[in-house]
């Protein structure tokens, strides 16, 4: 079990796991060996934290968090000292225009922009919309082409709300970006956000009369690797897919998984053929199959999947891993981390081959982000 220090002690080269829960955020720090972890938290006690990010562009270490309260709403907080202090909680820079008739319910995703655009950032929010900042997060505005999309009145919330949980900027072509939300599916732009096209060909919507509509799919997560920018992987509400043409079409890759239902999906930091998922049983039960906690990994871009269970409980483990609660660091070998709704955090320092319990007893985990501190 990790120690519980009085403050943040992350140093350059350390690995940081940022964990968002329904009752605050927790920071876990280790050296490069990733064998012993120290915990700092809770930050924002009593508030839900669905989105966290470390912005390491330019050698900086800026933490971003989006704590939310049912009474006081959602805020966006910044720390320039790895969580020792945070920006003013009363600042509310993320707002919908009054004429839109919308109000911010929750921030689901914080995405720093390209390395050579240090002032650019994006947010995915609920009700579903993409916000952009061009001044390092000081001010924010919704992307007009998405806010005013002709499909907006037809989008409906899933069980988790009408939430934009995925933002995938194209690493080469700055005019291209892909987003995903529940329930609406995948949309992409090729003109810097002026227009957006539904991009769900091949992705099924099992819960609709038309199983393959233009939009309306309940996509749970999409990931890509910068070395293969036009290839995408998608975990759907029933369905596991890959696209090789920047979401023009999707192919089923549920080869050897116990269930193609799940939420979480993460990309290996250096291998564009390696992806991690955590399958869940059925639409109603939503726990890992056979009560065995297993991460599944493909090393051939979805042609086959294999369970990773060394160090994970294989009996009586009725666990659930949510859509943003699985991530990888950028170390070599890669670290892989996930959190469960029962408040456990697990980590691997060897590409997922073996696992250890980082911490247990946390509130329900909804977000896990990992990074090497620059």
Placement of each model-derived feature along the sequence:
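Extracellular glycan-interacting surfaces
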Residues: 1-374
């Amino acid at each position: 079990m990790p120690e519980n220090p009085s403050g943040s002690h992350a140093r350059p080269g350390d690995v940081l796991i940022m964990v968002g829960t329904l009752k605050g955020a927790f920071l876990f720090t280790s050296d490069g060996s990733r064998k012993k972890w120290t915990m700092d938290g809770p930050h924002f006690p009593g508030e839900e934290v669905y989105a966290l990010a470390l912005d390491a562009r330019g050698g900086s270490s800026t933490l971003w968090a989006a704590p939310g309260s049912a009474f006081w709403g959602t805020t966006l907080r910044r720390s320039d000292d790895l969580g020792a202090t945070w920006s003013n909680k009363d600042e509310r820079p993320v707002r919908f225009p009054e004429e839109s008739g919308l109000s911010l319910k929750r921030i689901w995703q914080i995405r720093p922009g390209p390395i050579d655009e240090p002032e650019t950032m994006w947010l995915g929010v609920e009700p579903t919309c993409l916000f952009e900042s061009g001044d390092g997060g000081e001010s924010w505005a919704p992307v007009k082409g998405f806010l005013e999309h002709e499909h907006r009145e037809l989008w409906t919330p899933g069980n988790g709300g009408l939430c934009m949980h995925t933002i995938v900027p194209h690493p080469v072509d700055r005019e291209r970006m892909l987003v995903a939300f529940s329930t609406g599916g995948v949309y992409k732009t090729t003109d810097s956000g002026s227009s957006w096209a539904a991009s769900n060909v091949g992705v099924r919507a099992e819960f609709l009369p038309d199983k393959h509509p233009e939009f309306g799919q309940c996509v749970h997560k999409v990931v890509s690797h910068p070395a293969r920018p036009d290839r995408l992987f998608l975990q759907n509400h029933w369905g596991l897919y890959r696209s090789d043409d920047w979401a023009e079409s999707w192919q089923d890759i549920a080869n050897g998984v116990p269930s193609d239902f799940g939420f979480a999906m993460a990309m290996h930091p250096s291998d564009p053929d390696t992806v991690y998922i955590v399958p869940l049983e059925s639409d109603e039960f939503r726990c890992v199959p056979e009560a065995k906690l297993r991460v599944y990994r493909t090393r051939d871009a979805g042609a086959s999947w294999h369970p990773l269970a060394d160090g994970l409980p294989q009996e009586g483990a009725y666990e659930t891993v949510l859509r943003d609660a699985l991530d990888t660091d950028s170390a070599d070998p890669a670290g892989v981390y996930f959190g469960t709704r029962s408040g456990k955090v697990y980590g691997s320092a060897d590409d997922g081959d073996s696992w250890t319990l980082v911490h247990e007893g946390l509130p329900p985990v909804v977000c896990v982000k990992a990074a090497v501190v620059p």
